[in-house]
């Protein structure tokens, strides 16, 4: 009982600090003190990707997904990236999430590795934004996010056929053999040459069901399905695009715990246009508004440590309601929050 009371006192204090004050006219850029790469190595289990405070989306690179080393999907000591998935745990020390892995690549579509070395010196991350160059493919990847949607921008530099792998079977698991079995049910539909919708039911740390809408700003000209392995329920799709060197493809992913319609509404309300820079700026603004609620003095190093800690603290818990306030609760029930908030991932 004492432990429970202590937890709620801590949570209340955090709430008073961050939720009771509404600052306006913020001038200083507090995001410049955040280093998302802190904790990416030595089993720190943090990720460098893009998210907003307490959002459902944490879109980030994955360098591995089949051991305790990859609870957040990424270890900066690795030399290659296997794709970019839409949600991640942060600092928890348990594997889960990593839903919908997407990898842009070029050249031979039968590439069996589906991963690339990356230029660590050109990797960038700050609140609400991440970018990296996949050196094997010559593709620049940029990521940003809203509360319920992820946005990708892939710039293809090489004069080779452009492709995107959409892996609906992938996820972050404890051991590699679970990659074939953690998806226990899946449905997928190709609406047109711009859209993919569906749902997955998965079981790793807990059993979850999520619905998705994936949209491209350019039509794919061809699509292939990779041969599934024994026990797999979800599909892996290879999409080809007609691009010239230097052109890009943008991808948006909406998620919902309730329905495909909920994921679609998230895209319509939060991310209706193909304006990557606008979403990036809004995400940074959301973080700066939160971080600015506490102003501290100290050295540059001390400020980086402090504001990065606040940043990591406010990635979770995650508001899993749809735009209309509905969410999937215990026993697979659909519930409604009149304030549009219901928090999951209550791990500290």
Give the residues covered by each predicted segment:
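Bacterial N-terminal signal peptides
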Residues: 9-18
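Accessory carbohydrate-recognition regions in carbohydrate-active enzymes
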Residues: 26-348
């Amino acid at each position: 009982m004492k432990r429970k009371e202590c937890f709620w006192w801590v949570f209340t204090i955090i709430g008073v600090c961050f939720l009771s004050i509404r600052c306006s006219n913020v001038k200083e850029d507090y995001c410049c003190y955040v280093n998302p790469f802190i904790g990416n190595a030595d089993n720190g289990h943090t990720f460098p990707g893009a998210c907003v405070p307490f959002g459902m989306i944490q879109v980030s690179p994955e360098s591995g997904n089949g051991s305790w080393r990859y609870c957040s999907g990424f270890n900066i000591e690795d030399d290659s990236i296997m794709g970019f998935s839409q949600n991640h745990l942060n600092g928890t020390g348990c594997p889960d999430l990593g839903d919908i892995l997407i990898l842009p690549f070029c050249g031979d579509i039968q590439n069996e590795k589906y991963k690339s070395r990356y230029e660590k010196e050109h990797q960038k991350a700050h609140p609400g934004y991440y970018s990296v160059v996949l050196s094997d493919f010559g593709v620049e990847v940029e990521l940003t996010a809203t509360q319920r949607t992820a946005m990708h921008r892939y710039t293809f530099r090489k004069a080779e056929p452009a492709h995107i792998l959409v892996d609906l079977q992938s996820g972050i698991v404890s051991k590699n053999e679970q990659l074939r079995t953690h998806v226990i049910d899946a449905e997928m539909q190709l609406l047109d040459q711009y859209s993919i919708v569906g749902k997955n039911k998965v079981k790793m740390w807990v059993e979850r069901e999520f619905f998705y809408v994936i949209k491209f700003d350019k039509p794919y000209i061809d699509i292939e399905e990779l041969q599934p392995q024994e026990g797999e329920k979800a599909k892996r799709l290879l999409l080809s695009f007609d691009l010239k060197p230097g052109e890009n493809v943008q991808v948006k992913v909406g998620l919902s715990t309730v329905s495909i319609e909920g994921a679609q509404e998230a895209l319509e309300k939060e991310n209706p246009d193909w304006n990557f820079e606008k979403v990036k700026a809004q995400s940074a603004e959301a973080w700066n508004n939160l971080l600015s609620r506490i102003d501290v003095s100290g050295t540059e190093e001390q400020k980086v440590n402090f504001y990065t800690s606040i940043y990591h603290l406010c990635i979770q818990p995650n508001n899993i309601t749809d735009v209309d306030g509905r969410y999937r609760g215990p026993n697979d029930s659909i519930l409604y929050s009149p304030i549009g908030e219901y928090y999951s991932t209550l791990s500290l």
